[in-house]
Amino acid sequence: MEGKGRITGHTGLLALIGSPVGHSGSPAMYNYSFEKLGLDYAYVAFDIKVEEVKAALDAMRLFHMRGCNVTMPCKTEAAKYMDELSPAARIIGAVNTIVNEDGKLIGHMTDGEGFVGNLRDHGIEIKGKKITVAGGGGAATAILDGAREISIFNIKDDFFERTLETAEKIRKEVPGIVVNVYDIADTAKMTEEIQSSDIFANATIVGMKPM
């Protein structure tokens, strides 16, 4: 890349939007990767509140940004302004990745793709399997990959109703699929579901930081 390590008049712009984003390691990770791969892109983080999402996406088109990642609390709001949604994003009603194709914004929900891909890399297929998920992350991806049944355990908080809505969308998207949502505090039920499952996935934040 000409002018390696420097921003030029041709440098493409990508970003992370959400709030707060000051702690994010994404800019360092992506910019390091771009430099190593010789890609003329720069990645920055913008602190965007929910009420600013539409304006941010309009600016994304205006400045011909190639795309962006979306973090909390903007994922659901951003989905409202997409020109097109991937199947998983449509089911969940939220996006964490947006691609700008000549002004057409395409929203994706990639949570779960790494999980499913890692299983496949280790010779484990999702198709036809029963899966129990703590936290709900990746549920749509697992279903769209052919899982026959999924049990989701979530905390009964503000997001529990949204999980129930997601389960209903999954049933409509994939007729015949079995999807159940339970309170994660019901340890007896969780034990029962795990014992009858082929795969158990922890999609909560527990384990992301040292205890």
Q: Which residues make up each language-model segment?
A:
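Phosphate/diphosphate ligand-binding glycine-rich loop within oxidoreductases
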Residues: E2-I124
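Receiver (REC) domain switch-region micro-motif
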Residues: C68, I131, F200-A201
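Rossmann-like adenosine-cofactor binding region
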Residues: K172-M211
